[in-house]
Amino acid sequence: MVRLGQVMYLHKDAYEEYAKRHAELWPEMKTALKKYGATNYSIFLNKLTGQTFAYLEVPDEATYNEIAETDICKKWWKYMEPLMDTNEDNSPVTTDLQEVFHLD
């Protein structure tokens, strides 16, 4: 299992709406996440900076990254775009983090 961590960047006035939309995650998006291997997925918010920290585990990154090509993922990105920093394709601007410690 591969452990992934990344930072994303929310707009200051979007914290509550971001949390609300994730609390109401579309069933189709949840199914896609699981289909492409995501497990133990959590997102944390730093209200002082607007940064989120996402953590998830996947069997392999290549399979998980294929989710970006699905219609449901692209629809979710468009839905979330007003709330966060995004790229031209509406995907969130992210910073991948390097794991430096793990304790089982």
Swiss-Prot record:
What do the Gene Ontology cellular component annotations say? cytoplasm
Its pathway, per UniProt, is: Carbohydrate metabolism; L-rhamnose metabolism
Q: Which gene encodes it?
A: rhaM
| Positions of transmembrane segments | none
Q: Enumerate the subcellular locations listed in this protein's record, separating them with semicolons.
A: Cytoplasm
Quote the EC number: 5.1.3.32
Q: Which InterPro entries match?
A: Dimeric_a/b-barrel, L-rhamnose_mutarotase, Rham/fucose_mutarotase
Catalytic activity reads: alpha-L-rhamnose = beta-L-rhamnose
- Function in brief: Involved in the anomeric conversion of L-rhamnose.
The cross-references to Pfam families, in alphabetical order and at most eight, read: rhaM
Molecular function per GO: L-rhamnose mutarotase activity
Q: Which domain of life is it from?
A: Bacteria
Checking SUPFAM superfamilies in the record gives:
Dimeric alpha+beta barrel
Please report which protein family the annotation says this sequence is part of.
Belongs to the rhamnose mutarotase family.
Instruction: Tell me which residues this entry annotates as catalytic.
Output: 22 (proton donor)
Q: Which UniProt keywords apply?
A: Carbohydrate metabolism, Cytoplasm, Isomerase, Rhamnose metabolism
Provide the assembly information: Homodimer.
> Which GO biological process annotations does it have?
rhamnose catabolic process
Q: Which HAMAP family match?
A: L_rham_rotase
**Major localization listed first in the record, in broad terms:** cytoplasm
Q: What name does UniProt use for this protein? A: L-rhamnose mutarotase
Entry binding sites for substrate: 18, 41, 76-77
Which top EC class applies here? isomerase
